[in-house]
Amino acid sequence: MQKSLITTPIYYVNDIPHIGHAYTTLIADTLKKYYTLQGEEVFFLTGTDEHGQKIEQSARLRNQSPKAYADSISAIFKNQWDFFNLDYDGFIRTTDSEHQKCVQNAFEIMFEKGDIYKGTYSGYYCVSCESYCAVSKVDNTDSKVLCPDCLRETTLLEEESYFFKLSAYEKPLLEFYAKNPEAILPIYRKNEVTSFIEQGLLDLSITRTSFEWGIPLPKKMNDPKHVVYVWLDALLNYASALGYLNGLDNKMAHFERARHIVGKDILRFHAIYWPAFLMSLNLPLFKQLCVHGWWTIEGVKMSKSLGNVLDAQKLAMEYGIEELRYFLLREVPFGQDGDFSKKALVERINANLNNDLGNLLNRLLGMAKKYFNYSLKSTKITAYYPKELEKAHQILDNANSFVPKMQLHKALEELFNIYDFLNKLIAKEEPWVLHKNNESEKLEALLSLIANTLLQSSFLLYAFMPKSAMKLASAFRVEITPNNYERFFKAKKLQDMVLQDTEPLFSKIEKIEKIEKIEKIEKIEKGEEALAEKAEKKEKEKAPPTQENYISIEDFKKVEIKVGLIKEAQRIEKSNKLLRLKVDLGENRLRQIISGIALDYEPESLVGQMVCVVANLKPAKLMGEMSEGMILAVRDNDNLALISPTREKIAGSLIS
C-alpha cells in the first residue's frame, strides 16, 4: 500500500482559529479522504507552533507563562478540528519533548556538515513575521522601516546568531523546481519562487538571543543564550511527528510523498527554507506544495481591528458543517483569494445542495417507491440510455481528474453538473408520462440510470462532504469504502438495487431577507453603517457638473486608449505599491508601464491579462523607472480592479 503525508501548517498560537485556518485544514482533510478511498495509507498531520517572541509577549500581557498560554490556545485549535470531525492522524505541538529532541539533533547534523556557522546579524527585525528583512527590500516610509511582507514597522537590531548557508542551495533549489514543474501549485506560485531564488539568496539567521521562549541549542554547542529560530523549529514538525531523530514510532515512509497545504503568506518559508533544510539533512523533498489564497469578508480583508474575523465553528453551528465545507471548497478557485458572504453561502446551500442534489434524491426515491416498490434492475440501461450513461461517466471522470491538480472548485463544479444533468434528464423524459403510457421497461432503465449515477457520485462527494455522501450512498444500501470505490466508482459497474428512504440530505434556508437584516444590524454595531451613510451624504452634496466641467468630443479624442496584453510583471525593489509591467500594445516592442497595483495583484496573476492602457500619456519616471503609459483601473472603497475588455481583443486595438 502506498504511503503518503498530507499536512497543514502548524498554526501559531498568538490568536484563536478563524475561517482561514479552517479553510486550510478542510482542504487537507478533503485530500486525506480522497486518497484514502483510493487505497493510499495517508498520514494527515496538523498542530500548533508555540515558540517565539510574539508568544512570549502575548503570555506576559496575560500574566501567564508562555507554556500555559500555549496550552490554552492549542487546545482551542484541537477542539475546533474535532468539532469539524476532521480525520487527522497526528496533532503536533512544538513544545512536545520529542519535537525538541528532533530539532536539536537536526541542528547538530547541519552544524557538523558545515551548513551552520556562527556570526553577527544586523538588520531590520519584524516581530510579526519573526524574521529579519533584507535591507534592500524594506520600505522606508516617513522614517519608519516597514516589513515588505506584512507592512508592519520593523526594529533595527544587532545580535549574535548562528546562520544556515542558504546561499549554497540556490542552484540545487532551481534544479529541483526545473525537474519538478508541478512541485508547487498553482504553477504561477512556482514561477514566483524561482524568480525570487534567481535574485540571490542570503544566508539565513536561525537562532535568537533577544528572547528566551524557544528550543535551546544542543548541549554540546555550549551556547545557552541562543534559542532556535522559529522557522527551523516550526518546519521540522513535518518530520518530528513521524519519528525523525527522536525515537518515536518511525513513520518516515510517509514522508517521501508529502503534500503540504499552506497559505500564500508563508510560501517563501516552505518553498525555499524547507527544501534547503531537507537537502542539508539528506531527506527526500516534498511531492507537492499546495498554496491557497486568503479570504476577505464582503470585499474587506479580515482584521481584528475591523471586528470582521469570522469564527468558522460558529458559522458551522449556524449553517452546518457539511454546508460550510462545500461553500469554502466550491466558491473560490484554489490559489486565488475568495470573498465570504452569508448571502452567497445561503444561495449555495439552497440552489446547489438542497435543490440540485437533495431534491433529486427525494424525487428518485419517490418514483422508485411509487412505480417499482424501491426495486430497480439495471439490465436495460444500455439499451435505452447508452449516450446518457456515457455522458454521466465522462462528467464523473472529469470531476475526479481535477482533484490531483488541486482544482477543487472545478471538481465540485463538475460533480454538481452531474446532478444538473440528471434533473434535466427527468424533465426531458417525463417518467410520469412513461408510466402513463405503460413504458415500464424504459421507466425502470431511466430510474436505474439515475440511481447508479447518484451512487457513483457519492464516492467522489465523500472527500468534500463525507456525512452527506454516506447518507446518499445509504439510500442504495452501500457503504463508502475503498473496495466499494473500486467496484462502483472506478469500474462503473451497474447494479440492480433495492433503494430505501433516508432522511433529507439538506434543508432549505428560508428568508434570505432575514439574514440581510441581521447583517445590517451587525454592521450598525460595528459603525460601518454610519460610515456608509456619511459617504452617501457627501456624494449627494456634490454639485452637478457645470458647463466648465464638460469636455468636448475633440478633447476626448486626444486620449488614446488601447487594449494591452501584459507579458511580464515584476515587483520594484524598495516599493510595496509599484509593479513593473511589460505590455504589448501591438507595436514592434513592449512598453514598460509602472503601475501602483502591487497591494491588490500578485505579479504572476497579471501575465496574460488584457488591460486598457492610456497609450499617449507623456512618459514619466517613477522610483527611477520610466513609465510609458497608464493602466486603467477602478477603485471601490479599498478594492481596486483592473478594467479589461469583456472579450479577447488584439493587442493594440483602439478603444473608442
UniProtKB/Swiss-Prot annotation:
Annotated Gene3D superfamilies: 2.170.220.10, HUPs (3.40.50.620), Isoleucyl-tRNA Synthetase, Domain 1 (1.10.730.10), Nucleic acid-binding proteins (2.40.50.140)
Subcellular location: Cytoplasm
Listed GO CC annotations: cytoplasm
Cofactor note: Binds 1 zinc ion per subunit.
Signal sequence, renumbered to the chain: none
Catalytic reaction equation(s): tRNA(Met) + L-methionine + ATP = L-methionyl-tRNA(Met) + AMP + diphosphate
Coiled coil segments of this chain: none
Key word Plastid present: no
Main subcellular localisation: cytoplasm
One MF term in the entry's GO annotations: tRNA binding
SUPFAM superfamilies, A to Z: Anticodon-binding domain of a subclass of class I aminoacyl-tRNA synthetases, Nucleic acid-binding proteins, Nucleotidylyl transferase
Record-linked PANTHER family: METHIONINE--TRNA LIGASE, MITOCHONDRIAL, METHIONYL-TRNA SYNTHETASE
Similarity annotation: Belongs to the class-I aminoacyl-tRNA synthetase family. MetG type 2A subfamily.
Function: Is required not only for elongation of protein synthesis but also for the initiation of all mRNA translation through initiator tRNA(fMet) aminoacylation.
Designated name of the protein: Methionine--tRNA ligase
Organism: Helicobacter pylori (strain J99 / ATCC 700824) (Campylobacter pylori J99)
